[in-house]
């Protein structure tokens, strides 16, 4: 079919040749010069694709492959190959441009173009894998849209096979419906299942193209025929190509997604998706390109690639999916394309099986995961699983109306995509895929949240923070991070010295033996690390996830305990000296004192923490060391205000009062 011809012009040329060679197979709709055969890579391609898609709507146009291969095969093959390379490059550019071009176009246009593009690209890839890369210039059977309707699927298959072989020979041009997919997943070219599916898709898609004789016009022209594509549509596979097509087609604003369900974009999607049940595609033709709007051009591309795989899986379930797709027309453009594949082929022909295999071979897993809808795929891709699910669910509900694939709303989602292996469970698949997408999104979110909440990630503790899976993890972690920021220095230095035990003791030493370092150690180790993070944070220590404790040595604990007996608050100088003497960081010492004060407070509920257990050697609690410790280190104790840090020695009293 013209689709084989690489350029839109070639499409028209081949359309004319097809008119002669195919012997009037070309429908009157197909015009060599019709927009469908436009040479413009974007608009012409889109038009050609649309017209090609719509042009052959009447007959299967199975003759096209034969004719194209025979009549246009040699010249067109060369041209298409060139065009394919160009189109693939063009599609790549258009893929990048498609976002802008599609965005330029009305969202509906973008989507419809995207959808059409996938269809056109898919159609072209079906008819011409080489031409397909023509950015759908000749992808659509421009001339053959109306005039060329291949009655024999065999011819189309021949053409598809040639195209498939061509795209296999030249993975780059990949007029293949899966051109985009293949570009990203070149290994699919070596996948016999994928290739077979692609070929069948091409055959079906050729039928689709022929089934759109009314779409010689640009995509904008609504497909007057409801895409009664009796031909199986390999659309599922084409959706892979769809992203390229969408990037290619955007220039044809005529294909505004607003166009009625007959809009070529929708029809292209329908054609592409109905490769399994082309006869049911006509209902899809009613699907408005607006649904195509749903997916953004870029999303459409991503989704289409996934959709192609998903469509393959869906196509497996295409019979139910086609109804689902038509029902869920609004779901998403990408999902429309997929649903077109599935809804267009409600019968779930081998193409769907192929599509499924293709999914399995290439994007199968991803497509299966995103199987619910193209939007669901997008949801899976973009964590939009909820919306996609809803759309999919709707599509699934409609999908139950398998015959309702004609329903304008194209549930672009084949539930089977989420469940690749389940080719028949469309509604359940859609739901499953929706739920799977949702679960996946949830898992991702949970994972992200867990990462964010993971105290180990942000505490900077050398030691593992321990399991922070508690629901209170946030508050604890914040508290603990506060602690750990203080303790981390301890932990780091102490961990270097293997001070975990000491830190545990120290940190846990919230409340027992103040004076006895060993008992303190025991209490620390045994006691909850209440004072750990927040010297007054006792109580949360046991329940909240614990930061890895600084392991204080017994000597360190004894020294710290003795110092604590002397003064419960260390001055900056004292803390520094003590840290240096104990080979600890000031933060570790500070945190230890905070925890120790907390423990002491617990042990001595009514007593002033600031009152030194033992009068400082300098002369009682008011010794300069005591003052400094109280003043400067009162901050270490959460209870005393931080002001004492900066207070003069007199602040020692303040710090005591603070406590």
From Swiss-Prot:
Gene Ontology MF term list: DNA-binding transcription factor activity, RNA polymerase II-specific; RNA polymerase II cis-regulatory region sequence-specific DNA binding
SUPFAM superfamilies: Homeodomain-like (SSF46689)
Disulfide bonds: none
Organism encoding this protein: Drosophila melanogaster (Fruit fly)
Keyword DNA-binding: yes
Binding region for DNA: 545-604
Record protein name field: Homeobox protein slou
Alphabetical GO biological process terms: cell differentiation; muscle cell fate determination; muscle organ development; negative regulation of transcription by RNA polymerase II; regulation of transcription by RNA polymerase II
Gene: slou
Biased amino acid composition, Basic residues: 201-232
Region spans: 7 X 2 AA tandem repeats of H-P: 221-234
PANTHER family attached to this UniProt entry: HOMEOBOX PROTEIN NKX (PTHR24340), HOMEOBOX PROTEIN SLOU (PTHR24340:SF37)
């Amino acid at each position: 079919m013209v689709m084989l011809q690489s350029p839109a012009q070639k499409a028209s040329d081949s359309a004319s040749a097809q008119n002669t060679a195919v012997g009037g197979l070309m429908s009157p709709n197909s015009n060599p010069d019709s927009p469908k055969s436009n040479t413009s890579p974007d608009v012409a391609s889109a038009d050609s694709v649309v017209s090609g898609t719509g042009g052959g709507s009447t007959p299967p146009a199975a003759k096209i492959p034969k004719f194209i291969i025979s009549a246009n095969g040699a010249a067109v093959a060369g041209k298409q190959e060139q065009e394919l390379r160009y189109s693939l490059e063009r599609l790549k550019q258009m893929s990048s441009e498609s976002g802008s071009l599609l965005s330029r176009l009305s969202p509906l246009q973008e989507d419809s173009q995207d959808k059409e593009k996938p269809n056109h690209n898919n159609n072209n890839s079906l008819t011409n894998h080489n031409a397909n890369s023509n950015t759908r210039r000749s992808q659509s059977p421009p001339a053959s849209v109306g005039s060329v309707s291949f009655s024999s699927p065999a011819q189309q298959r021949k053409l598809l096979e040639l195209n498939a072989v061509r795209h296999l020979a030249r993975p780059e041009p990949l007029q293949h419906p899966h051109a985009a997919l293949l570009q990203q997943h070149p290994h699919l070219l070596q996948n016999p299942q994928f290739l077979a599916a692609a070929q069948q898709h091409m055959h079906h898609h050729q039928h689709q193209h022929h089934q759109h004789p009314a779409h010689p016009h640009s995509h904008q022209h609504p497909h007057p025929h409801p895409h009664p594509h009796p031909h199986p549509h390999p659309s599922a596979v084409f959706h892979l190509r769809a992203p390229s097509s969408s990037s290619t087609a955007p220039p044809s604003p005529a294909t505004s997604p607003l166009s009625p369900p007959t809009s070529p974009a929708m029809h292209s999607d329908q054609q592409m998706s109905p490769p399994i049940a082309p006869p049911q595609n006509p209902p899809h033709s009613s699907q408005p390109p607006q649904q195509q709007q749903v997916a953004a051009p870029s999303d459409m591309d991503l989704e289409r690639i996934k959709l192609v795989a998903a469509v393959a899986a869906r196509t497996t379930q295409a019979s139910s999916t086609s109804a689902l797709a038509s029902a869920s027309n609004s779901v998403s453009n990408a999902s429309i394309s997929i649903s077109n594949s599935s809804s267009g082929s409600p019968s779930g022909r081998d193409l769907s099986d192929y599509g499924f295999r293709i999914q399995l071979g290439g994007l199968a897993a991803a497509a299966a995961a995103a199987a619910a809808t193209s939007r669901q795929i997008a949801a899976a891709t973009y964590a939009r699983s909820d919306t996609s699910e809803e759309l999919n669910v709707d599509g699934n509900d409609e999908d139950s109306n398998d015959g309702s694939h004609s329903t304008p709303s194209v549930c672009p989602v084949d539930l089977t995509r989420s469940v690749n292996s389940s080719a028949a469970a469309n509604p359940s698949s859609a739901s499953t895929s929706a739920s799977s997408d949702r679960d996946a999104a949830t898992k991702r979110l949970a994972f992200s949240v867990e990462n964010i909440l993971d105290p180990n990630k942000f505490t900077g503790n050398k030691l593992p923070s321990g399991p922070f899976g508690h629901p209170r993890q946030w508050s604890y972690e914040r508290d603990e991070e506060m602690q750990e920021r203080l303790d981390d220095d301890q932990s780091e230095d102490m961990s270097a010295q293997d001070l975990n035990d000491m830190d545990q003791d120290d940190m846990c030493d919230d409340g027992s033996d103040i004076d006895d370092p060993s008992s303190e150690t025991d209490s620390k180790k045994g006691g909850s690390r209440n004072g750990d993070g927040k010297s007054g944070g006792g109580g949360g220590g046991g329940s909240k996830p614990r930061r890895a404790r600084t392991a204080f040595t017994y000597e360190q604990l004894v020294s710290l305990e003795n110092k604590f007996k002397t003064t419960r608050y260390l001055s900056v100088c004292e803390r520094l000296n003590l840290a240096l003497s104990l080979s600890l960081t000031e933060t570790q010492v500070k945190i230890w004192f905070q925890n120790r004060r907390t423990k002491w407070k617990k042990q001595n509920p009514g007593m002033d923490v600031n009152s030194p257990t033992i009068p400082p050697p300098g002369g009682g609690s008011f010794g300069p060391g005591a003052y400094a410790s109280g003043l400067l280190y009162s901050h270490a104790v959460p209870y005393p205000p931080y002001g004492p840090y900066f207070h003069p020695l007199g602040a020692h009293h303040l710090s005591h009062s603070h406590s």
